[in-house]
From Swiss-Prot:
Gene3D superfamilies: Nucleic acid-binding proteins (2.40.50.140). GO terms for biological process: translation. The modification 3-methylthioaspartic acid is found at residue 89. This is Small ribosomal subunit protein uS12. Residues 1-25 are annotated as: Disordered. It comes from the Bacteria. It comes from Stenotrophomonas maltophilia (strain K279a). One of its GO terms (cellular component) is small ribosomal subunit.
């Protein structure tokens, strides 16, 4: 515990908020153009080819965004919507593409958790 004299000399410092997704500039989502669409491998215990895209946002920032779901139609110059949310086993990937919005098509034949992948309700 600090003494009163120590607190007079140097007051307590309030903890500063640090955003987990700074490129969004406090927006819920951001639009951007894919500059490169490629696959990458995850960190140590996991093994896969994860689909990611390098995206230039409307505020001129370049970020790496994860493309969720099975299969996608994205290529260079595709316009996508980006939301926050990191991928734990991909270092440097701190954003997700929103499926079913702009040029990113929803996941085909998706039955469960459809709203997360932009899939329409299947006909009964």
């Amino acid at each position: 515990m600090a003494t009163i004299n120590q607190l007079v000399r140097k007051p307590r410092q309030a903890t500063t908020y640090k955003s987990a997704s700074p490129a969004l500039d406090k927006c819920p989502q951001r639009r951007g153009v894919c500059t490169r669409v490629y696959t990458t491998t995850p960190k140590k215990p996991n093994s896969a080819l994860r689909k990611v895209a390098k995206v230039r946002l409307t505020n001129q920032e370049e970020v790496i965004s994860y493309i969720g779901g099975e299969g996608h139609n994205l290529q260079e110059h595709s316009v996508v919507l980006i939301r926050g949310g990191r991928v734990k086993d991909l270092p440097g990937v701190r954003y997700h593409t929103v499926r079913g919005s702009l040029d990113a098509a929803g996941v085909a034949k998706r039955r469960q958790a459809r709203s997360k992948y932009g899939a329409k309700r299947p006909k009964a």
